[in-house]
């Protein structure tokens, strides 16, 4: 090694010898392992918005009923009972409650969500994780720093740029300034995600139980246990059919929900005309004031029941990916909203006259002639609404897995037409057990309603917080507009939240327990994922070490292609050095494969792979980054291996055509390192007679020797007069030779080399970290799907390399 020179002895403006060497090696490493930003194809205007005819818009609005509004549409089944669980004392209380329902529907679903929040979508994708992805593109808030500037060139990587000095730029700088702010943002996002998972348990339970409750209304002597049993049977059937997908029966959803809305709207209009038209005075907000003045604390607590009238709003936002925003706005404004208002007004008109029927207001207000048809349609609508929530939960879990926030689970694509229709067996059975447990344990709608309301209002609060950042960073709204939106949203939602707090001991604790367990799982998994990535980054092998091994890497190069999987998008991973140290042989062609997820909903197939060469051509080492969005799936018939090798062949052709001569952009490592190569072979050969500890000693000495020869590794330009290159081969011949070699290696066999990593807490770590890593994460890693299973790697071509990471 060169002697170290103190900075004080070097003239100003000059670098030390050591600094010059380090700088030269850094420059060389950058040239040999270049950023991957040149060869990806760009699809221009792939997602250009297309104009829709009015007929097509109406058709899509109709279809959106079955997917988007099933959950929101079934709320009339249970709202009034949960608002007055102890009975109705004064008919004016019904008018006050109706007024609250009307303005809740107006402010939250209609104004806030349909016309404001739904515009904050990620290329059509909604939900808390979609908002988080949008924020990750506009600010550096992602905790796993595996992105590269080439990712920003993706067709789907849309973002806006803030003007320097603007309020948006200041907000961005503030958010990126501290690590704890990024973590706090992620915790908020995960909290909303956990509550949405809780919705996947509570929505089917309360919807199906409320719908089947109609049996008892027509037969008052029937035991309540029979109603619960019927609901459980329907729930078991619903979850058992999930693996078939909704592709074959999905066409029924929209007609069922359409008939449901027409039924409740017509019934509501009938009841208004028959019982009491004066309920229409509830459109005056004065009755809200009189309601709270008259009922006091009890009126405030009843907001927990009123809240159920807007449940399903978050599901509406999460499901907007299937339809144009304008179609959703038309369907809600001109059909769903009026039908819901008529339904609630009709029930209120009935309750003003028949206060004793507060427990079954919906079914009791139905005319006898249409009772059983309404019961059948109500049950169908409850199933459709539950199906939409269950499917939404699958999508949320899929997104969480892609963000590194949830253990790997099996995901099955159930439709050939629609990318978003998936099925998660593991999550499905957990949801089913949760639904059955909630339905059988509580039995009463009011207790499940309290739990449901708690989950819904917390998701809304999380959405409001994220919308503030969207309005500042993405939309660049004036801070006064942001302040008005924040104040109005928090005023309404915190009012509801303060009411559900009083009902935590009456069922409201259920979503909190579900959220706590889910948040623990997701937080620990993400924390361990970040620590694994940091460990790999710090332990990656330098290019100088690779160059020191020579063209054959100091190993026996056996025929075939080795795909070495790693989390790193740059640098040589630790798994490679660990592998060749213990097994001194490697394939003739080595490809480091990094499968990474980006904060975009999808990556087009044409832009999926990025390929670069590592080191000189004689090394035959490449890097391939396979990029996916959070909605993309690893399907078994994707033919990942062939697509990767096809992209590699294309890269070789393009690279050869772009080079004027075969040696124009390559770098030689043969000068003065032949001895290093021979010594390395001898060292590894001697390792066969020693134990593992001796292997590591030999490996260390080999690295030390390589480092001592760093000053002998220089670019090809400086060696032009020393090393002779053959200029006889044409570009076509060189390309043909390398492609033929690649084809021969492929025929010899492709081996997938993956790390079987055990993560342990470093000695001296504090107790919570040891529990999280050594017990919670270890358990989750043991029961989750292996990477090889997720990527559909054939078992016969898989080679696992054991590693232990101390984080």
Curated annotation (Swiss-Prot):
One of its GO terms (molecular function) is potassium ion transmembrane transporter activity. It is a multi-pass membrane protein. Keywords: Cell membrane, Ion transport, Membrane, Potassium, Potassium transport, Transmembrane, Transmembrane helix, Transport. Pfam families: K_trans (PF02705), K_trans_C (PF22776). Residues 81-96, 207-225, 270-299, 344-369, 439-454, 503-507 are extracellular. Disulfide bonds: none annotated. The chain crosses the membrane at residues 60-80, 97-117, 186-206, 226-246, 249-269, 300-320, 323-343, 370-390, 418-438, 455-475, 482-502, 508-528. The keyword Nucleotide-binding does not apply. Its main location: membrane. It is found in: Cell membrane. It comes from the Eukaryota. GO terms for cellular component: plasma membrane. Putative potassium transporter. This is Potassium transporter 9. It comes from Arabidopsis thaliana (Mouse-ear cress). The lineage of its organism: Eukaryota, Viridiplantae, Streptophyta, Embryophyta, Tracheophyta. The gene is POT9.
